[in-house]
Amino acid sequence: MRIGILGGTFDPIHYGHIRPAMEVKASLKLDKILLMPNHIPPHKNTTHSSTAQRLEMVAQVCEALTGFELCDIEAKRDSPSYTVVTLKQLSRLYPDDELFFIMGMDSFIHLQSWHKWQQLFELANIVVCQRPGWHLAEGHPMQHELNVRHATLEALSHSSAPQHGRIFTVDISPQDISSTQIRSLLAMGEIPQDALLPVTLNYIQKQRLYFS
């Protein structure tokens, strides 16, 4: 089974997370995608809703969408959400499956700053979502990794046994949505209906999240 993994703060989860995940799922013919809320993101000091509330929002999205599942292993962890630790745990949970860790190009270009980043390739494939405006500069350290590890979608269709260590690039539709924008709109009393799944908007309104 091919399993995609998309981690994030999801504060709140919105179409800017979901639509690219759907496009990756379709492009790589993934069987399912795990949506994985962070508990203590290493690069962020705080969140605007509780871990329990973010878990519930993601759980409701997964109930509404086919092929998406909540993964709460990072949310249950008391230590920072380092990806290498998470992938080791997921490799034990899914020993016979092929893991695809999904990230944006904006994250990929900083991958060398991640904790034990080189071990990621021993545990999973990396899927880089290409967005307008982000390009690797000539001579960028990650350009070498991309050159060596890049795999085509055609190669994926011919592989049967689970593999890891490959980098797939997937062109995604531009998403002009961010959690920060959504929180700002809600704080001003505006309802960003086009940015959120109905179940998420309903939960936010019931819980009075992000409203000033």
Swiss-Prot record:
Entry keyword Repressor: no
PANTHER family recorded: NICOTINATE-NUCLEOTIDE ADENYLYLTRANSFERASE-RELATED (PTHR39321), PHOSPHOPANTETHEINE ADENYLYLTRANSFERASE (PTHR39321:SF3)
N-terminal signal peptide: none
Known pathway: Cofactor biosynthesis; NAD(+) biosynthesis; deamido-NAD(+) from nicotinate D-ribonucleotide: step 1/1
The gene coding this protein: nadD
Enzyme class: transferase
Name recorded for this polypeptide: Probable nicotinate-nucleotide adenylyltransferase
Protein transport found in the keyword field: no
